[in-house]
Amino acid sequence: MKKSMPRLTAKNAISFQGYLPINGIQQWVQIEGQETTNPLLFIIHGGPASTYSMFTEATRFFSTTFTVVHWDQRGAGKTYLKQPVMPDNLQTLVNDGLALTKQLKGAFPGVQIVLLGSSIGSIIANLMVQQAESSFAAYIATEQMTSRSHQIAFNQTLFDSKKHVLKTAWLNKLPYAASTWSAKQIAQFTIFFALQHTDVPNMVTDLFIKNLLHAYGLNIKAWLAFCRGLIASRQAIQPELDSFDYNRLFSKTSIPFVVFQGSHDPITPTAATQAYFNQVQAPYKRMIIVPNSGHLCFFSNPKFFLAELTKQVTPLIS
């Protein structure tokens, strides 16, 4: 196994970066933890193709309590760099994620796996839970996507901007029914919303770009692969995402279900997430608002996230 990050100091620590064979292609995986018997935190990134493996500082912080697993999905990041193969559909990514889950179970026998789905990854991870629920000890949703996410965000922004003529005029250029928005219009609205909330970290400028430029060992070739993967993956599966039937998300699960929600999230606003959360039946469920954060709340406020994760989830799986 290729190792390009320094090992952690704990005796039973693990620090691995490399390609693993997953459903016919080589896919990039990073695993880092200070104790191999700790629960695994398997992170399903958003996007499409917005890899989180560059967030090494935040996830190294998480690795004090969990063994953190990052996976650059088919068509994303360093997996795209190795071979520019696109997913046929969302189920392809679900299948890949479940195949990697089996490998993790083999590599860490008897260790619990906590699945975390973020943004678009919350759709993929939700489907993974439905298709292999017994593989996971708990499901954590951050930036949970729902059918009403964009509409509620738009309605709230329009209300907040009613005293500002120019802002209202710009918003009125968008169709009122957010379900009809194109990917370009969604991106435009997200940028507009972020500019209205400068008191919280901006997903693009403060989180993605900063970490892309400073991630350990990330080079220009890998950076370009990240960008090209974003474009290619969007072309491949965005039509399915645009028409996704959110009734496919589970309404009942037999494992603990915890949601982390950014206090000022422009893409998955609190009201939309709360509505879905209220519908779900689970043996244990909790929704936690992450203060002073927008989208990617667990990277915006990693200390708060880890403290709450340890408090809410660790006792349930120990």
Predicted regions and their residues:
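The serine-hydrolase catalytic nucleophile loop
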Residues: 48-60
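Short beta-strand/loop motif that positions the catalytic acidic residue
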Residues: 253, 259-261, 265
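Catalytic histidine-centered segment of alpha/beta-hydrolase-like enzymes
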Residues: 293-302, 306
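Conserved alpha/beta-hydrolase
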Residues: 63-81
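Conserved hydrolase catalytic core segment
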Residues: 110-153
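Alpha/beta-hydrolase
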Residues: 160, 165-248, 255
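Glycine-rich "HGGG/HGxG" loop immediately N-terminal to the catalytic nucleophile
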Residues: 52-53, 75-88
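Conserved acidic catalytic loop of the alpha/beta-hydrolase fold
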Residues: 92-112
